[in-house]
Amino acid sequence: LNRKRGRALTEADLDQLPDEPLGDHVLTLRIAEVVAETDDARSLVFAVPDGPDDPQIPPARLRYSPGQFLTLRVPSERTGSVARCYSLCSSPFTDEALTVTVKRTADGYASNWLCDHAHPGMHIHVLAPSGTFVPKTLDDDFLLLAAGSGITPIMSICKSALSEGSGQVTVIYANRDENSVIFCDALRELSGKYPDRLTVLHWLESLQGLPSAAALAKLAAPFTDRPVFICGPGPFMEAARVALETLKVPAAQVHIEVFKSLESDPFAAVKIDDAADEDDAGPATAVVELDGETYTVSWPRSAKLLDVLLAKGLDAPFSCREGHCGACAVTLRGGKVSMEVNDVLEQQDLDEGLILACQAHPETDSVEVTYDD
């Protein structure tokens, strides 16, 4: 997708845009409520459309884990649409509706459009919840570091851990000033409900300046034995990373959520060119475990595994389709693959057999993978 910023479309403009062919993996949700969290942040509460002409969405397609995100398709006059990922602030354990929070940014076309034009009753295309910024267990003690709208997935993890887990939760939350604190009331209510388990430490730049690595290290020092989840602007996450390195927190304990702008269109219909393999060894065979079922599919060597699965109608998880986010990660059980791009898996992940389905090509005649580990 072209990321140049065009003028913001009004709702009256939408009917004038040409329809883009969308894949069968695309879902349509209805905005049930828009909540003004701060002057520049809005929460979008979604509902499943239930009109007679609305397609049915199986509940499993909207099942999610704390810390995951939705990818939204936002209309654009210049490009037809842009795709943006927004973390779910809702908890699958305490909230009935999926909810994302969008903070307006100065040069962000999508965030400005959503803050200006999203309203109850509006329908919007999304991809199924995805992402790997997810605790392995909710019974751990947690250290959660957030800045600005980075509180969104942190809030989901916090609410879920308090509701379903048994450990201590510490949130370190940095903002520009008191008026820019998203979920201020909700955090206060949670602190009152769980006074012996939740500690929220606020950092206000207007009073304390920018949070440095040294300052964050001092705040985090009592909690170095916990899993750490970090989300926020780049400089904040870098300061937090340095702080944890200074404290010698093992890298395996540290989880960082990073979103990148998407260059391709993850909403587009997937096309597989079977003829492309005519001059080589022919297609490989993939045996795929997904949601408790086992599927055997023909895998053209020129095609990526995710594209093959989507073209077959399988509900494989993904988001960016560019090798950046890790949402499509799957465990390789047998055979060999090559990946075009890998911007997210570290050597430890590769050693454990993880691959990116959106970038994987077969190197052997048979490949076995599982999404169910």
Language model regions located:
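Local cysteine-cluster metal-coordination motifs and their immediate loop/turn environment
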Residues: 153, 310, 314-339, 349-364
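C-terminal accessory/binding modules appended to enzymatic or scaffolding proteins
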Residues: 281-321
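Short, surface-exposed secondary-structure boundary micro-motifs
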Residues: 75-77, 129-130, 372
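Ferredoxin-reductase
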Residues: 10-123, 140-141, 175-178, 188, ...
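FNR/FR-type flavoprotein reductase catalytic core
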Residues: 112-278, 282-287
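Short flanking/linker segments adjacent to small metal-binding domains or redox-active Cys/His motifs
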Residues: 206, 361-373
